């Protein structure tokens, strides 16, 4: 006797592929259209296009470590993406609250891995600022990773399956 199979959430990898494609398309535009390290205002006083490069991780962590960090970040991104893909294969398709953040993180992580393989660094181009305070430059892959991490955090806070039961 076989048990009924339920569709898993691997279909959400289509979102990951879309994020990778959009991320790489925007970075191709940046590399052919924006000058290096010169702000191009989008919204004065808040947002610039600003082509820059990051050999490190978030907030340029380990960016001056000498090159070995590229392989560390590639291994981490591929390992985490592999784990999240495995989790998607075990997640029922209807559980979009789990599948969506996993797909976002996978797409963003692989988008930045492609940069590291192609260029030896990640291409950043979105710069937000207020007055003299500048947030570190980032890209669409970074945005997907952050949105996915926030989604996982919110899910863990508000998921009714894991909340204490009241008598």
Curated annotation (Swiss-Prot):
GO MF term set: aspartic-type endopeptidase activity
Catalytic activity: Release of signal peptides from bacterial membrane prolipoproteins. Hydrolyzes -Xaa-Yaa-Zaa-|-(S,diacylglyceryl)Cys-, in which Xaa is hydrophobic (preferably Leu), and Yaa (Ala or Ser) and Zaa (Gly or Ala) have small, neutral side chains
Pathway note: Protein modification; lipoprotein biosynthesis (signal peptide cleavage)
Localisation: Cell inner membrane
Keywords: Aspartyl protease, Cell inner membrane, Cell membrane, Hydrolase, Membrane, Protease, Transmembrane, Transmembrane helix
Keyword Cell membrane assigned: yes
Enzyme class label: hydrolase
Membrane-spanning parts: 10-30, 68-88, 98-118, 138-158
Keyword Transmembrane helix recorded: yes
Bilayer topology: Multi-pass membrane protein
Main location class: membrane
GO biological process: proteolysis
Biological role: This protein specifically catalyzes the removal of signal peptides from prolipoproteins.
PANTHER family xrefs: LIPOPROTEIN SIGNAL PEPTIDASE
Protein name (database record): Lipoprotein signal peptidase
Native source organism of the sequence: Xylella fastidiosa (strain Temecula1 / ATCC 700964)
Lineage start: Bacteria, Pseudomonadati, Pseudomonadota, Gammaproteobacteria, Lysobacterales
Gene field: lspA
């Amino acid at each position: 006797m076989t048990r009924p199979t339920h569709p898993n959430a691997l279909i959400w990898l289509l979102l990951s592929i879309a994020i990778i494609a959009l991320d790489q398309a925007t970075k191709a535009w940046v590399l052919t259209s924006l000058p290096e390290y010169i702000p191009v205002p989008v919204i004065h006083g808040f947002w610039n296009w600003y082509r820059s490069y990051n050999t490190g991780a978030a907030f340029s962590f380990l960016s001056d470590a000498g090159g070995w960090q590229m392989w560390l970040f590639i291994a981490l991104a591929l390992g985490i993406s592999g784990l999240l893909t495995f989790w998607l294969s075990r997640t029922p398709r209807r559980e979009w609250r789990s599948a969506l953040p996993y797909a976002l993180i996978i797409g963003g992580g692989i988008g930045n891995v492609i940069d590291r393989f192609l260029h030896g660094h990640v291409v950043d181009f979105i710069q937000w600022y207020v007055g003299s305070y500048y947030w570190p430059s980032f890209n669409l892959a970074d945005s997907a990773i952050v949105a996915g991490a926030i989604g996982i955090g919110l899910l863990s806070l508000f998921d009714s399956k894991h909340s204490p039961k009241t008598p």
